[in-house]
Amino acid sequence: MHILVVNDDGPPNERVSPYVRPLVDELQSAGHLISVAIPAASRSWIGKAHLIEAELTAHLVHPDSFRPDGSWDSTYKPDPTTEDGAAGPQSDWVVIQNGTPASCTQLGLHNLFTDLPPIDLVISGPNHGRNASTIYNLSSGTVGGALEAVFCGKRGIAISFGSKDPQTDSVIAAAARLAVKLVGHLWRNWDERVELYNINIPMREDVEGQPVLYTRTLPYYWSRGCLYAETDRRKEEARRVLNGATNGVNGVHKETNGVNGVNGVNGVNGVNGVNGAHHGEPEAEAEAGTVSKQRHFKWSADLSDMKKRLQESEEGTDAHTVLNGSTSVTALRANFWHVPGLEGPIDLEL
């Protein structure tokens, strides 16, 4: 089977993307033809988004050239006397600058591997942590990559390894073996009502001996406050003014933001790394001491209530299953379906 692997955690990285290489290796060991297209930077919580104003750049990267921090050695050359080295470019992964999980799926299906047999299945993941409950599933870039596959006429499977804590190699290997076995089972026994599966695998040494259960998605809504916290940038802005406001030339603020110039967009900071130059902010161009007309916020989600709700979740849900040591498989369809019965004319006078 030809499988496209995408993810939302980016290149192999000991801290934020430790699971993708072990899964790819295990899939290849099972005899599958594997093509890999992944974003150049973490794109968690991005759902099925595309950065439509960004130009995407595909970098061919040999998997053995990745460093522990997710960067890679662009001068790396595999040993041609080995089986992997002799495979040439076919063994390369594709790392996509400005990529998202959904755009990696698009390019992987339609542009990057046209010299290979048609892709049968898209696997998105493994995510670094659980994707259980409606909030996680609708926000997840991992699930988003599998959703995009469905809209391209392919089957999709989202896989999440259920812990962000450091894991031993043996625990990761066990999760990867189970994932590959489960993928094979689902492929052979695919229910035609299903468009994608969402899998959550707990990280434990004996995971292969634990139950694997079909589950339903836990409904959940934010129970408190905003996901962002306001920051006080006044001192920082005053300091920037005194130091000449911007780091670039003529008010252009350049920011490579990563290794090999691939984490930002074209190495120049536009809107959160999307194309173009980031000109000096009005605040920075004003004189120190003026009243700011800007407010600044950073991601600061309080997940304590959510974690408590997940711990108390009902038996049979994805969250309850994975938190109690079993593997969760949730069968999904790729839609926001309408509420039945609300049809026909609307009387605005009521």
What are these regions (language model features)?
Residues 131-140:
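Glycine/threonine-rich flexible loop motifs
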Residues 2-3, 12-13, 17-118:
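A cross-family phosphate/adenosyl-ligand binding-site feature
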Residues 35-37, 95, 123, 155-159, ...:
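Hydrophobic/aromatic beta-strand patches that form the interior of the parallel beta-sheet core
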Residues 135, 146, 150-174:
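Glycine-rich phosphate/pyrophosphate-binding loops
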Residues 186-350:
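C-terminal accessory domains and tails appended to enzymatic cores
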Residues 8-9:
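Active-site metal-binding loops of divalent metal-dependent hydrolases
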Residues 124-130:
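Short acidic, glycine-rich surface-loop motifs adjacent to enzyme active sites
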